[in-house]
């Protein structure tokens, strides 16, 4: 039996059944096809595509999303593409409202690199629908954002529900650390004004049964550690034990900032006192989610998480620093590796830092710690 679900918001009745129908029909018939086309565009963030301007993929992604936005039947909607010399483009939209407040909605259009490890039949630039999941690079991070934002606004306007003055931005450098965003925001400052709230559609949710709010995210320090020991590769049977191993020295340097046995960051300046309110919230979230805190990740059989306490796992991923090696150069593949003592080891470091840590001073400290007095005079 069909039931008409209703609610009241600011004195206006809401037909939830009608709203749900609009969302589902729009998502299935309009958003999924357009989002699938967006997935096909290899719009790598500038950090991963130094020739992004010449390649034109970011431009294509921005144009694609902007074109869809312009077609939406939203009263008062304006859509424009903002450009600054040498910077990635940004979509700026406005929807005037009936409430004398401003809300800023944020999303981004650039993507992470392709990576490897896709399951058979799946790939980064080929959208594949399997059940209720759409696979492909950038669909969830963060291509869906503009689609979701404007569909939500349509739902409000369809039922005459008052809303604030809405300003929307879709940037294209987020996966590189948003280096272009500050200049765009400065250029748009007078038009954006002072938002009463910022909605950032680039996060996650614990489950589908609750409304989740992201209170803070960790920042990231990204850099490369390059250890050089020789000007040419030499036979390890001849030089091994004489020329120091660049990999060993890299490990030694990393031990200055991280305990290799536990993974704990050993630089005090990268830690903060966690507010008691956040600890309490982590405990509540752990009770709600249970093992889903870690079981949502693709662990191999027999591999265990870093802690058996679910609350501690939540705090680990939100309020504590962590180091990961996300790339490496100077190493041949295992199949191509011979008996050569390599000239260098180059590692890309990704260091997550919690809210409250000064990123500039932390970056300087990490660089100094890793590079001062390298073992055996390595370069």
Language model: regions and residue ranges:
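Short, conserved micro-motifs enriched in small and acidic residues
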Residues: 34, 134-147, 175, 240, ...
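Histidine/acidic-residue-rich, glycine-tolerant segments that coordinate divalent metal ions
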Residues: 163-244
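Short glycine/proline-enriched loop/turn "hinge" motifs that connect secondary-structure elements
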Residues: 119-120, 160-161, 214-220, 317, ...
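Active-site-proximal alpha-helical scaffold in enzymes
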Residues: 143-159, 178-186, 244-256
């Amino acid at each position: 039996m069909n039931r008409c679900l209703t609610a009241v918001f600011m004195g206006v009745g809401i037909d939830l059944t009608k709203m749900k129908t609009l969302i589902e029909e729009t998502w299935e018939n309009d958003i999924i096809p357009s989002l699938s086309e967006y997935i096909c565009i290899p719009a790598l963030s500038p950090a991963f595509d130094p020739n992004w301007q010449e390649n034109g993929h970011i431009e294509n992604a921005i144009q694609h999303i902007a074109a869809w936005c312009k077609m939406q039947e939203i009263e008062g909607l304006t859509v424009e593409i903002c450009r600054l010399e040498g910077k990635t483009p940004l979509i700026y939209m406005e929807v005037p409202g009936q409430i004398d407040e401003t809300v800023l909605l944020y999303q981004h259009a650039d993507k992470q690199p392709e990576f490897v490890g896709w399951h058979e039949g799946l790939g980064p630039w080929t959208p594949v629908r399997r059940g209720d999941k759409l696979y492909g690079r950038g669909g969830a991070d963060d291509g869906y954002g503009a689609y979701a934002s404007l569909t939500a606004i349509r739902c409000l306007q369809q039922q005459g529900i008052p809303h604030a003055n809405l300003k929307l931005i879709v940037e294209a450098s987020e996966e590189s650390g948003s280096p272009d965003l500050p200049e765009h925001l400065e250029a748009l400052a007078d038009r954006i004004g002072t938002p009463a709230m910022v909605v950032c559609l680039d996060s996650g949710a614990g489950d589908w049964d609750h409304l989740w709010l992201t209170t803070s995210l960790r920042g990231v320090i990204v850099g490369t550690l390059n250890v050089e020991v020789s000007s040419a590769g030499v036979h390890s049977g001849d030089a091994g034990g004489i020329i120091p191993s660049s990999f060993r020295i890299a490990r030694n340097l990393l031990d200055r900032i991280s305990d290799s046995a536990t993974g704990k960051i050993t630089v005090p300046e990268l830690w903060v006192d966690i507010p008691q309110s956040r600890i309490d919230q982590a405990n509540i979230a752990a009770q709600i989610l249970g093992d889903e805190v870690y079981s949502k990740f693709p662990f191999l059989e027999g591999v265990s998480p870093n802690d058996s306490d679910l609350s501690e796992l939540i705090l680990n991923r939100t309020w504590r620093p962590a180091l990961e090696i996300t790339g490496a150069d100077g190493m041949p593949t295992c199949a191509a590796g011979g008996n050569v003592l390599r000239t260098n080891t180059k590692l890309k470091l990704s260091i997550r830092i919690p809210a409250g840590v000064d990123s500039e001073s932390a970056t300087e400290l990490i660089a100094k710690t890793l590079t001062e007095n390298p073992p055996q005079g390595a370069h």
